[in-house]
Amino acid sequence: MVRNLKAIILAAGQGNRLKPLTDEKPKCMVELFGKSLIEHQINAYKSCNISDISVVTGFRNDSITISNVRYFRNERYQITNMIESLFCAEKILDGDVIVSYGDIIFEKNVLKLLIQSDNDISVIIDKNWKDYWSMR
């Protein structure tokens, strides 16, 4: 069965813990190995044949200029959370949708596992999350 998957990347936040790197750009635009975090994600999606990609922006939305991507804006990003950002893209929340945070990197093989899931709802987690969380 071929699925028509969509991706929504939540990228509205500034990333206060990453200052000064995020003084003038959102955290999804911080570079790692010569590409922004969001570019790494978009490349992973495209490598898995997901081309219907939307980004919910907020802080310095003008600095996210990726072509062939649909944009939504959370005007209230400073006082809301990721759920509210997701609802900014509510009109496309039908069918099979993958939601990711704009400040993470995942490998293509992890995305492939998610795509192969037959479940109605699937979540990919890092079992070592607590170690990373405690470093915050």
Kindly give the residue locations of the regions a language model identified.
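Active-site micro-motifs of SAM-dependent methyltransferase domains
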Residues: 16, 106
